[in-house]
Amino acid sequence: MSHKRPQSSAGESNGAVDLKTPRFDPVSLGLPAEFQLTDYTRLKGCSCKLPQPKLLALLQELSATPGQKDVGMDCSIVPLHHTNSKGEALFLVSTTDFFFPSVSDPFLQGQIGAANVLSDLYSMGIPDCDTMLMLLAASTEMDEHERLITTREIMKGFAERARLATTTVTGGQTVMNPWPLIGGVAMAVVSEAEMVRPTGLLCAGDILVLTKPLGCQVAVNLKQWLLRPSPLYEEAIAGHISPEEIEELYNMATDSMRRLNREGARLMRKHGAHGATDVTGFGILGHANNFGAAQAVGDAPRSLCLVLERLPMFKTAVAASKQMNDKYRLLEGYSAETSGGLLVAFPSTTAAAAFCAELTAVDGGCPSWIVGHVEDRATNAVDGVYARLKDGYEIVEV
């Protein structure tokens, strides 16, 4: 039996207006009925990242290396010895990302993997990726038949999102590994005017916008527990949150994770964004802190703090987090997101609201939220802290 997938129409360009995530049917692929890709890994999605403090310590050593540019933010930005037809200097903007499976369906995992790789380019206000490479590990824990099918489906899903982003996969590397792995490299050659650097423009009074809800890590774990019950599920979740609520949460989260941030990249430039980052493995507060810290270096350093006042979260993820004593730190702002939204700074509430309205109109009706502001950092601020949750911050349940 063939495993048919919905095809995007020619007019679709952003990954939000295609059909909803199809229900995973392993048997239709020739896999055992009980097959789940997440059985072959213990770490999921962007939660596999090295803890942020350890990573930043390593990056400090790397940043001291002569010739390194923009180390530590979402993309590498390297000046080229070429100009465009207008005589403007060109830059190679590149990024790489990969992770272990977070969902059961290998095709969907490929889609999410590609969307996540592209997101770093999009956080630079670059909507057009020139080329992608695919990085893939096939699991040695599967039998040969399962390995062939899952690898094929992951590659198909990755390539489908690349096509939706109007780019192509031109190379990569495939290896064997106990845990499956999917990711890649995204590259674009642009002029200064064609990107929004994450540093240099941010200032006190800027308004912060988030383009996707939070709670994906909670969603994928609840889904796995629904299929493979754990003691925590039995103790804290069963009897409090229904299987139907978990399925709804999972479907909302996977639709969000596979949705491209491409339109957000295009519109942030149009509406005069001062900078952005994407929210992934360190959680929104971790990435906001990194964004704020990046302003304190460079030619015009600023000591700023990003204040998060209201956060959109999947409602069932909020309920589950409260039942589990916030095991994944969603309510603290540190829950890992996979292929999360863009956190964008705008010079005014008017610009931020216009961005949100237009993005909803062109991105399949998906909302964005004004979530906070930028302020001058207190002179007695704790060393290394450049972002905070406002006391009693508002949770917007989605």
Curated annotation (Swiss-Prot):
Its required cofactor(s), as named, are: Mg(2+)
The positions flagged as active site in the entry are: C46
Residues bound to ATP are: K49, G72, M73, D74, D97, D120, G171, G172, Q173, T174
Q: Name one Pfam family in it.
A: AIRS_C
According to the record, cofactor stoichiometry and binding are noted as: Binds 1 Mg(2+) ion per monomer.
Which cellular components does GO assign to this protein? cytoplasm
Q: Where is this region: Disordered?
A: 1-21
**What are this entry's molecular-function GO terms?**
ATP binding; metal ion binding; selenide, water dikinase activity
Site note Important for catalytic activity, residues: K49
Gene3D superfamilies the UniProt entry points to: PurM-like C-terminal domain (3.90.650.10), PurM-like, N-terminal domain (3.30.1330.10)
Instruction: Quote the EC number.
Output: 2.7.9.3
- Binding of Mg(2+), residues: D74, D120, D278
Task: Tell me which Gene Ontology terms the entry assigns under biological process.
Answer: selenocysteine biosynthetic process
Give me the segments passing through the membrane.
none
- Keywords in UniProt for this one? ATP-binding, Kinase, Magnesium, Metal-binding, Nucleotide-binding, Selenium, Transferase
Q: Which EC class heads this enzyme's classification?
A: transferase
Q: Which reaction does it catalyse?
A: hydrogenselenide + ATP + H2O = selenophosphate + AMP + phosphate + 2 H(+)
InterPro entries in the record: PurM-like_C_dom, PurM-like_C_sf, PurM-like_N, PurM-like_N_sf, SPS/SelD
Determine if Magnesium is one of this entry's keywords.
yes
Concerning its family, UniProt says: Belongs to the selenophosphate synthase 1 family. Class I subfamily.
Q: Its biological function?
A: Synthesizes selenophosphate from selenide and ATP.
Subunit details? Homodimer.
Instruction: Identify this protein by name.
Output: Selenide, water dikinase
Q: Which gene encodes it?
A: SPS2
